[in-house]
């Protein structure tokens, strides 16, 4: 027969284990679910209140930006990749859009207006179309690709064998295969398209774009989500504070001047 002391002992073991707070909470939730299951089977169980044991904490930030060394190696080897992968990677690198969005780009999505260059994309997660700025060189490369392969306006830029949109997993698999052949790797993995969103978000924020601006560009619904894409955030906050106080060395707390008089 299960007693409250048994649960207390189990929680104590978990508490002393070297596990994340989220893992701890998951174990507590699983235990509650199991007891509820027994209750549904008409097996008498003690009353268990998981909220008394759950820990409070903050979600961990995973640094996922692709190292510059890896990017430099990949770009150096890129001319040897199949042409469609070359262009898909450059779009990913320059825009940080989702892999699914790269695969569903249509001819005519890249265009110029005066000295400005734009890309029109449909963000499936947000269910809306938006326009983002892109380098002029990228627009030229896309236009050349469309002309070379006779891709008509409105057709998918990257097609599967049946003429539909290119498959996202196929893109990843082909990139991994090409990277393996050339010894390109990123630590314990070879290629993850989504990590380039971290690179772009981190770069934008590091160059003075506000959190709100980065959020709007990436198409997130909240700033908290956007912060998960900005790597080295604590270091950047400390750096910003150092810069502020170095420029305001005469800064004094209110009342300090009066005390000196």
Explain the meaning of each model-derived region:
Residues 1-62:
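N-terminal core-binding DNA-recognition domain of tyrosine recombinases/integrases
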Residues 44-76, 122-123, 159-164:
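Flexible interdomain linker/hinge and immediately adjacent N-terminus
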Residues 57-60, 69-99, 125, 197:
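Basic, Lys/Arg- and aromatic-enriched nucleic-acid-binding interface segment
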Residues 95, 104-143, 261:
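Conserved tyrosine-mediated DNA breakage-rejoining catalytic core shared by Y-recombinases
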Residues 110-114, 189, 209-228, 256-260:
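Short, polar N-cap/turn motifs at the start of nucleic acid-interacting alpha helices
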Residues 123-127, 218-243:
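Catalytic-site neighborhood detector that most strongly recognizes the C-terminal catalytic loop/helix
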Residues 151, 173-216:
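Short, basic (Lys/Arg/His-rich) helix/loop patches that form interaction surfaces
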Residues 162, 244-261:
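C-terminal secondary-structure termini that scaffold catalytic or DNA-interacting sites
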